[in-house]
């Protein structure tokens, strides 16, 4: 089989490519240049897609003895991921750029080009498992499981994907990398949004959206408690950094309950007002009909809650057995049956 190994410059993608070689496949490595002005070096776990990452990917390919190329997808990444990220925050939503990147870049732009060039599949270093029939499952390493950020992929995308690391823990992957002589064996994982290398999401958004001041309002009294520079700096469920001038009468902490970019108003209140029991999402990847009993996950590293899901036209309606807090429009909801991914979508509406 001819496979294209997406090599980020990290340990996971390097070992995934190595395992594809061991499996007897005809492997070609590719590094995705996703920034128009990449930084020279990474700063710990901050960011990725630097020139250092490209060099690390090339060195790994050389050790494996496979051809290596760099594909410039910076323009498409900016349009499909970065611009959408900015637009979402400007509209009061909370997007997950990793989910979006998988949908539009790795398993769309890259996969489409790979198939057009005669490759049979794309190999990545994601920690998830794929059954022979294309069923997506959680990784055996719960701490590193990435099935959530893959949960909105369509069956045809998963059908041409390969995830060789799904049956291994991260510790096993690092030991294997060291044994293979891969210099990235101890390279730190990237934890932050890859295109915001400094980690200051609020400041980064302010540069692109501009200051849009408005009031911070108490949900129960309607009292203005403070001012903000822009709703983009807030997410539903946020507690820190509110800079409120008036403590709550009962002394309890306040959380962001609602964000209204139209009026530039941020509404805050007690934790119990964050409780959500019903979600309406788009039907990004939901092939099932009727009511399906399942478990719902709404954050990349969050827990699951028992739920029922039902397709209604283009909508996916999810009713939760117990409420979850801090869930916002823009997040992905991924639905499971045990470790098996049933599908998912992007949340548009939440309700108590």
UniProtKB/Swiss-Prot annotation:
Region Interaction with tRNA, annotated ranges: 144-146
Residues carrying the site annotation Interaction with tRNA: 126, 331
Main location: cytoplasm
Catalytic activity: S-sulfanyl-L-cysteinyl-[protein] + uridine(34) in tRNA + AH2 + ATP = 2-thiouridine(34) in tRNA + L-cysteinyl-[protein] + A + AMP + diphosphate + H(+)
GO biological process, one term: tRNA wobble position uridine thiolation
UniProt: ATP binding residues: 6-13, 32, 125
UniProt-annotated location(s): Cytoplasm
Pfam families: tRNA_Me_trans, tRNA_Me_trans_C, tRNA_Me_trans_M
Catalytic residues, chain numbering: 101 (nucleophile), 194 (cysteine persulfide intermediate)
Disulfide-bonded cysteines: 101-194
EC number of this enzyme: 2.8.1.13
Record keyword Cell division present: no
GO molecular function, one term: tRNA-uridine 2-sulfurtransferase activity
InterPro entries per the UniProt record, alphabetical: MnmA-like, MnmA-like_C, MnmA-like_central, MnmA-like_central_sf, Rossmann-like_a/b/a_fold
GO cellular component: cytoplasm
Keywords: ATP-binding, Cytoplasm, Disulfide bond, Nucleotide-binding, RNA-binding, Transferase, tRNA processing, tRNA-binding
Role played: Catalyzes the 2-thiolation of uridine at the wobble position (U34) of tRNA, leading to the formation of s(2)U34.
Protein family (similarity comment): Belongs to the MnmA/TRMU family.
Name by which UniProt lists this protein: tRNA-specific 2-thiouridylase MnmA
Gene that encodes it: mnmA
């Amino acid at each position: 089989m001819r496979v294209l190994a997406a090599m980020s410059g990290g340990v996971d993608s390097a070992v995934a490519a190595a395992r594809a070689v061991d499996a007897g496949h005809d492997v070609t490595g590719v590094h995705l240049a996703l920034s128009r002005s990449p930084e020279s070096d990474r700063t710990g776990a901050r960011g990725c897609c630097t020139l250092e990452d490209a060099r690390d990917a090339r060195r790994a390919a050389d050790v494996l003895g496979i051809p290596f190329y760099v594909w410039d997808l910076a323009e498409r990444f900016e349009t499909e991921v970065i611009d959408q990220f900015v637009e979402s925050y400007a509209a009061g939503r909370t997007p997950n750029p990793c989910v979006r990147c998988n949908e539009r870049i790795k398993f769309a732009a890259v996969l489409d080009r790979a198939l057009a060039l005669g490759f049979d599949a794309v190999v990545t270093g994601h920690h998830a498992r794929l059954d022979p029939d294309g069923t997506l499952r959680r990784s055996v390493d719960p701490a590193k499981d990435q099935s959530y950020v893959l949960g909105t992929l369509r069956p045809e995308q998963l059908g041409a994907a390969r995830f060789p690391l799904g049956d291994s823990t991260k510790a096993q992957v690092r030991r294997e990398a060291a044994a293979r002589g891969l210099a990235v064996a101890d390279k730190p994982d990237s934890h932050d949004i890859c295109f915001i290398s400094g980690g200051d999401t609020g400041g980064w958004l302010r540069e692109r959206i501009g200051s849009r001041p408005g009031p911070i309002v108490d949900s129960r009294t309607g009292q203005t408690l403070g001012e903000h520079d822009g709703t983009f700096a807030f997410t539903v469920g946020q507690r820190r950094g509110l800079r409120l001038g008036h403590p709550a009468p009962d002394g309890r902490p306040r959380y962001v309950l609602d964000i209204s970019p139209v009026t530039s108003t941020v509404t805050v209140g007690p934790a119990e007002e964050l409780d959500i029991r019903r979600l309406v999402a788009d039907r990004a990847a939901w092939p099932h009909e009727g009511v399906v009993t399942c478990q719902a996950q709404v954050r990349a590293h969050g827990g699951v809650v028992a739920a029922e899901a039902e397709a209604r036209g283009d909508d996916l309606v999810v009713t939760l057995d117990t409420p979850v807090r801090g869930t916002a429009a823009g997040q992905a909801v991924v639905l499971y049956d045990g470790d098996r991914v049933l599908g998912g979508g992007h949340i548009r509406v939440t309700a108590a």
